[in-house]
């Protein structure tokens, strides 16, 4: 009995046949697109062969497209770099100019600035000159000014003011000084303003001293246990205490003048209240 030959399937042969079939269909598909025979042959091909054919076609199309793009870009570069052309250079768009060459490169901005609507008139101070020299000590942006601290820091100016007052008084008393009437009036006004300023500063210092002493007494009595809570003065109480302290510090003549001013002020107020007002009938 003769032993039968066992034939095994060869995968290599199948792959070769499928590759041949694929190349045959591709070449035929490029030449005869849309024919009926092509459709019949495509229906007989396996799905794996069709998939491989599709991927090959995609690769071929992509390669062809990149070659065309490279050719176009090289043509554009050639025509752009041609320096023999007589025509004006083409203006690049704003989008191209805004693009940075490198991400770490500094950003570019236009040097063109719009013209100011406010025209500078010769003879009038401009806004820039007005705000050029500003004293930050008196700027509202830095908060409210501390008058007590400013007075303490600039207390040495009182000596200069006193000396200036003495010089002005001696100049006015000197009969040999060749001053006309206008200059004398101007010096008198300056002297009066300086004296009034010195008086206001003295009164302010007196008020601050009285109020600070009162606060110290209240805090000491609170620490000793004499008072349960420190009492803070109202405006009316402050006014009374300050008036009493001012009257005590005044000279007799100054006190009489102050009393006379108060009396006249009160009388004027009473007369205004008793004025006859005609009624419209």
Swiss-Prot record:
Record's keyword annotation contains Coiled coil: yes
Chief location bin: nucleus
Keywords: Coiled coil, Nucleus, Ribonucleoprotein, Ribosome biogenesis, rRNA processing
GO cellular component, one term: nucleolus
Regions of compositional bias (Acidic residues) in chain numbering: 76-89
Compositional bias annotation for Polar residues: 24-36
Subcellular locations according to the entry: Nucleus, Nucleolus
Family label: Belongs to the RRP36 family.
Subunit architecture: Associates with 90S and pre-40S pre-ribosomal particles.
Physiological role: Component of the 90S pre-ribosome involved in the maturation of rRNAs. Required for early cleavages of the pre-RNAs in the 40S ribosomal subunit maturation pathway.
Entry protein name: rRNA biogenesis protein RRP36
Lineage: Eukaryota, Fungi, Dikarya, Ascomycota, Saccharomycotina
């Amino acid at each position: 009995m003769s032993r039968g030959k066992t034939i095994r399937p060869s995968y290599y042969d199948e792959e070769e046949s499928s590759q041949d079939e694929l190349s045959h269909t591709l070449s035929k598909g490029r030449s005869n697109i849309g024919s009926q025979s092509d459709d019949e042959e495509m229906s007989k091909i396996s799905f794996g062969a069709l998939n491989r054919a599709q991927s090959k076609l995609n690769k071929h199309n992509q390669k062809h497209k990149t070659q065309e793009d490279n050719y176009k870009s090289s043509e554009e570069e050639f025509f752009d770099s041609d320096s023999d052309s007589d025509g004006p250079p083409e203006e690049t768009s704003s989008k191209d100019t805004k693009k940075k060459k490198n991400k770490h490169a500094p950003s570019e901005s236009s040097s063109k600035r719009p013209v100011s609507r406010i025209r500078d008139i010769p003879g009038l101070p401009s806004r820039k000159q007005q705000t050029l020299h500003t004293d930050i000590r008196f700027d509202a942006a830095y908060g409210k000014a501390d008058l007590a601290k400013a007075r303490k820091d600039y207390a040495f100016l009182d000596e200069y003011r006193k000396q200036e007052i003495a010089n002005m008084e001696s100049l006015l008393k000197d009969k040999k000084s060749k001053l006309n009437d206008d200059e004398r009036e101007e010096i008198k006004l300056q002297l009066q303003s300086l004296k009034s300023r010195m008086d206001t500063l003295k009164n302010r210092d007196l008020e601050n001293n009285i109020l600070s002493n009162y606060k110290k007494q209240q805090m000491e009595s609170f620490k000793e246990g004499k008072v349960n809570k420190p009492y803070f003065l109202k405006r009316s109480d402050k006014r009374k205490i300050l008036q009493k302290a001012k009257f005590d510090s005044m000279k007799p003549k100054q006190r009489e003048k102050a009393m006379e001013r108060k009396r006249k002020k009160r009388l004027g107020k009473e007369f205004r209240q008793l004025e006859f007002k005609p009624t419209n009938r």
